[in-house]
Every structure is written in C-alpha cells, then in structure tokens.
UniProtKB/Swiss-Prot annotation:
Gene Ontology CC annotation, any one: extracellular region
Glycosylation sites: N386, N437
Signal peptide, first to last residue: 1-21
Intracellular or extracellular location(s): Secreted
Disulfide-bonded cysteines: none
Protein name per its UniProtKB record: Mutanase Pc12g07500
Family, similarity comment: Belongs to the glycosyl hydrolase 71 family.
E.C. numbers: 3.2.1.59
Annotated source species: Penicillium rubens (strain ATCC 28089 / DSM 1075 / NRRL 1951 / Wisconsin 54-1255)
Amino acid sequence: MIWKSLFSALAILTHILPALTAPALDSELSSQSEDKYVFAHFMVGIVKDYQLEDWKEDMTTAQSIGIDAFALNCASIDSYTPTQLALAYEAAEQVNFKVVISFDFAYWTNGDTEKITEYMKQYAGHPAQMQYKGAAVVSTFVGDSFNWDAVKQNTPHPIYAVPNLQDPAEATTGPAKSADGAFSWLAWPTDGGNSIIPGPMTTVWDDRFVHFLAGKTYMAPVSPWFSTHFNTKNWVFVCENLPTLRWEQMLSLQPDLIEIISWNDYGESHYIGPYSAHHSDDGSSQWATNMPHDGWRNLFKPYIAAYKSGAKTPTVEADEVVYWYRPTPKGVVCTGDTLSAPMGADMLSDSIFVATMLTSPGTLTVQSGNNAPVDIEVPAGIVTSNVTMGVGAQSFKVARDGQTILSGQGGLDVKDSCVHYNFNVYVGSTKGGDGSNTTGARGSM
C-alpha cells in the first residue's frame, strides 16, 4: 500500500506535547475487554484467482498459531472483490474462522457510504463475521475522514468501527468521533507516515493512540519487517529486531486488539503467510520469490498465546531457533537495477538475526560465511541475538550440557553480488528433537 502521510512537523509537535502528560498506560488500558483477539491483514487485491480451498488453507494455517481473523483489505476498483469476499466468508464459516472487512481508502472515498453500508448489511450478521462487544467489526486502511454514523444507522446489525487513523489526535475530532476505536499502521520506527528513523522501535505512537482514544478500543499493529522496491515507493524501515521486540512491547501494553501486518503483502515484505502460487504478481516476485517467512509464524505463536492470557512473557514448549537475514550486505551495488538501493538501507546493520526459543539455557553457535563461529550463552525463553554477516553459508547450532540439541543451515547463502536490490529477508527455523531442519532450511526451496 502507498502510505499517504498527513502529518506536518508542526502537527506532530503540537500533539506529542499533550501526550507526554497522559496518564500511565496501565491505568488507561484498565477498561480493556477481557476478550483479546489477533487479526492478520490480508490483501484481497492480489488473490483474484483464489478458490475456496485456497482460502481454507490460509485460514487453517493462521488458526494454528492463534490468529482469530483476517482483516480483508479490499479495493472498490477490483471487479472480483464481491466474489472473493463471498468465498472468504464461506471458507471462514467452514473452518470456524472469522473475517473482518477492511476498506482500503486508497480506493474507497467518503462518497462511497452507500456501497460500504451495503457490504455491512450483507455480512454483519454472517456466522463468519468477527464480532466484538456484540457488534460486527469493520476496519480500514486510512479513511480518516469517513463518517461511520450513516453506516451504523442503516445497518440492522450493530457495527463496531475500528478504522485506521494516521494521526491519533483525529480520534477526538471530526468524523473519527463516529468510530468505536482506531487502528494504527505505525508498526515500524518512524516520525510519522513513511519517515524513516534509525530506531529503536518504541511505543510512542501506541501511547498517543491510547491517550487520544480515551477509553475507546485500540487495535495495535505488529509487523516483523518492511521493505519495498517499486519505482513509486522504494524504502526499508529499520526493523531488524521487530519480530520479537514488537511482541514484547505488546505483552507489556496488552492492547485491546492486535492486527498483524501482514499475512500476504509480498510487496512490502512483511508477510508471515506462505508464499502463495495463486496470487497475482505486482512485481514483488523479484524480492519475495524463494524468500520464505514461515519461520516467523513459529515465533509468533507463543507470543500470541501469551498476549491472550495476559502474560508478560511467552511460554516455550519445545526448543527451536528462528533466523532471518538479507541476501547481501547493504553496501553491495547491484548491476542490473534501474532503481537505487531502498531509502533507509544505510541505517541497517550487516547482521544475521537469530531468535532462540529454549526450554532451558543453552549455547547458541552461529557461523556466518567464512567468519569464525560465534558462541552466545542464551537463557530459557525467547531471546534475539545477532552476529556479523559473512558471505557464504549460514549455520546454526544450540548445545546444552555439552550435547548438540539442534543444528541446521539456512537455505540461502549470503552473496557479495546482485542484479537487483533485495532488502527482504530470508526466514528459516530449526527445531530440536531429531535435529531435523524445518521451514526455510537448506534443500527445502
């Protein structure tokens, strides 16, 4: 999606200062619902050829890690939107999953109230529709100035609107007051919109949303990555430790709802779902093909369970490592690309990132290319470590009490040459027990 930043520097300063005097988060979140749900942002616009079984496969895969619903991002201009929404609702009902319509206001307009109302009248009472506090959830991408009053008044079933607001201060003024809460898209280090800052990721935007919502529902964003390389948008956020850091923040904040960005947005490289052969290619295959992210689902699962239970730390039930790394060092000049390296690339580190998921302490050994092996003592639980990137194969091992409990090699070598810039990451995982490699391991591609 193309983020349309509506912030000016003055506006940011104007709204940040009041937020600094806001009450502590614990008190502001005390009225949250005991029922916590996790959604995943799903791009309907790239699945025009999906069949019922495709939807069911994605949904059961999402269910397996604790995701409750897909937020179905749909555009008004796509002729197949009605067909795919119908299939999504049918599939969700069959597998006991839920869905939410997320109107993408890069395409919908404030003049589409009647059309949006018709969709809500059609699906608000559907068995597969996600209900929250007795009402059908509806969301958006942008759409800050849309007034939900007419939709609510003309839909027999109660509506619970949680639109995406670009500026949290909008929650207290104008059309956004008609909503029941808000969803933030600011899941990466930023000063607002697409501005890129060195990081680290903080909860400053979450704090501001909670403050301005003043007790209304806050749906917080979680995203493991963001890199895109189109001629109209070409940047990468500093997001290297987000796969665990952002979840740690969520366990501390305990927001009302969470939306994972995303399930299948290959264009922005933050997908956690399988790379589907049945999607239409917008050019992102250049950086998403053979770059699996499946291992992140393994990593997210215990965090989702912890969030729903109100725990501050995740519970690890089996030993595993999940690793992610770029295919080239950031300074490599690609020979056949008409575009420059993504904006923000210089802020990244040339590192290999490894999340250990251990039932008890162990020694992580990482060898990156021709670099000497690096040993890191890691405690039980989930911990993210990193080592300097080296050109060549990437190998991972965990030992405990002098015995190797798991080992594996990444399925992608780091190279010092390239044709096109690719700041997406390769994600793999290796589980303990029989020492076998799992998702993203050598030979699985």
